[in-house]
Amino acid sequence: MIDISGHLRPYRSELGFEDNTRDFVINCCGYQHFTTKDFSRSRPNGRLDFQLIYIYSGCGYFKIDHNLIHREKGDIQIFYPGEPQEYFYYAKDTPEVYWIHFTGKNCEKLLADYDIHSCHIGENVLFKTIFQEIIFELQLKKYGFETYIASDFMKLLVC
């Protein structure tokens, strides 16, 4: 498995982070490529933040309202705060996924304004580039990086 990520804070929490004092904050962003071992994630009570998962290649399986949903390359899956999260990837499918966790008082409005929901959005190399930029900026944390990654996230919404 290849697992690359960047985080806003120097510590991590499986529950995520909630910040309703600001409009929008990216907590963390990452890339995973599963080639040798299967992977599963179970968060029965969800997280405190939002999560967007983009299937760049391969596929993944998501349990939503007791139904198993098969997501393929070019699909996104959105999880809202407190929404149960159960998903898994099989190494035989060699999935490559990008994910981002975010919080803030305007997140729901942003998703609604841009009509972002779990669906097929298609293959998009620009998505890959933007996710990689966000990961890189979260790792380096140069001056002004939070503004830069928020801008990158907006690019994801309009692509």
Predicted regions and their residues:
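Tight coil/turn sites that cap or link beta-strands
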Residues: 36-39, 73-74, 82-84, 92
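Amphipathic alpha-helical segments enriched in hydrophobic/aromatic residues interleaved with Lys/Arg
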Residues: 109-159
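Generic protein-terminus/edge-of-domain signal
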Residues: 1-70, 118
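Ligand-binding loop in jelly-roll beta-barrel domains
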Residues: 82-106
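A short, compositionally biased micro-patch
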Residues: 55-57, 80, 90
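Short acidic-glycine-tyrosine-enriched beta hairpin
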Residues: 66-80
